[in-house]
């Protein structure tokens, strides 16, 4: 199923923003949310949930989205993830993304089933698969976070973040066991195996 504008068109009197996040599951790096307000007169081909698009297709769609629509980014840091938990940090990133928009939305469609105190926010399960605005936001969030992890990889190359984007691949987990964790790792995240939690690394080359 390709995402469509049915929900947006059902709310034609509203300024509708779609919101999605990237990076809830990784062992390292921030969680990133994007908010997108689409211009319904400009439809971009290939807009789908970012997870089903190739990297090159995501990059191409990202350029078109950011050149055609209002969009913004919200980030919750590793420190906030460890302090509040990943769910609350994700909600924080989503709220920040909406606040950072240059236009104020009157309705906010969010992928998933999170609850927000702001009554503008409406959660839609599998929204990234059915809602064009949310799908657009999923692409912007994913590409933005991947680029952040590319930058962090240059600082700590042994973890392979240029390939795994902080997710728990064998290479990444083995590197944590060998070298310990960095300031960019989520110490609140647990997985099988022994980790040296006290080894906070400086720059590695």
Curated annotation (Swiss-Prot):
Gene of this entry: rnhB
Ranges of residues in domain RNase H type-2: 14-201
Residues reported in the UniProt entry to bind a divalent metal cation: 20-21, 111
Organism: Orientia tsutsugamushi (strain Boryong)
GO cellular component: cytoplasm; ribonuclease H2 complex
Gene3D superfamilies recorded: Ribonuclease H-like superfamily/Ribonuclease H
Manganese recorded as keyword: yes
UniProt cofactor note: Manganese or magnesium. Binds 1 divalent metal ion per monomer in the absence of substrate. May bind a second metal ion after substrate binding.
Catalytic activity: Endonucleolytic cleavage to 5'-phosphomonoester
Protein's name according to its UniProt entry: Ribonuclease HII
Keywords: Cytoplasm, Endonuclease, Hydrolase, Manganese, Metal-binding, Nuclease
Cofactor entry: Mn(2+); Mg(2+)
Domain of life according to the entry: Bacteria
Keyword Transcription found: no
Chief subcellular location: cytoplasm
Pfam families referenced in this protein's UniProt entry, alphabetically: RNase_HII (PF01351)
Sequence similarity: Belongs to the RNase HII family.
Subcellular location as annotated: Cytoplasm
GO terms for biological process, alphabetical: DNA replication, removal of RNA primer; mismatch repair
One of the record's GO molecular function terms: manganese ion binding
Function recorded in the entry: Endonuclease that specifically degrades the RNA of RNA-DNA hybrids.
E.C. no: 3.1.26.4
């Amino acid at each position: 199923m390709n995402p469509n504008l049915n929900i947006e068109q059902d709310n034609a009197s509203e300024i509708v923003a779609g919101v999605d996040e990237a990076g809830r599951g990784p062992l390292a790096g921030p969680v990133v949310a994007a908010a997108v307000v689409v211009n319904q007169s400009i439809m971009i081909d290939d807009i789908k949930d970012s997870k089903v698009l190739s990297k090159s297709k995501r990059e191409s769609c990202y350029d078109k989205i950011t050149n055609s629509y209002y969009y913004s980014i919200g980030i919750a840091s590793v420190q906030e993830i460890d302090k509040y938990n990943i769910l609350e940090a994700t909600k924080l990133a989503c709220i920040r993304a909406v606040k950072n928009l240059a236009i104020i939305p009157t309705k906010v469609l969010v992928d998933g089933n999170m609850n927000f105190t702001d009554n503008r926010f409406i959660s839609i399960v599998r929204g990234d698969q059915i809602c064009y605005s949310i799908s657009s936001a999923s692409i912007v969030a994913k590409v933005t976070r991947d680029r952040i992890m590319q930058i962090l990889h240059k600082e700590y190359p042994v973890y392979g973040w240029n390939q795994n984007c902080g997710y728990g691949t064998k290479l990444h987990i083995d590197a944590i066991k060998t070298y310990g964790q960095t300031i960019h790792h989520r110490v609140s995240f647990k997985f099988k195996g022994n980790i040296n939690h006290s080894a906070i690394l400086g720059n590695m080359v």
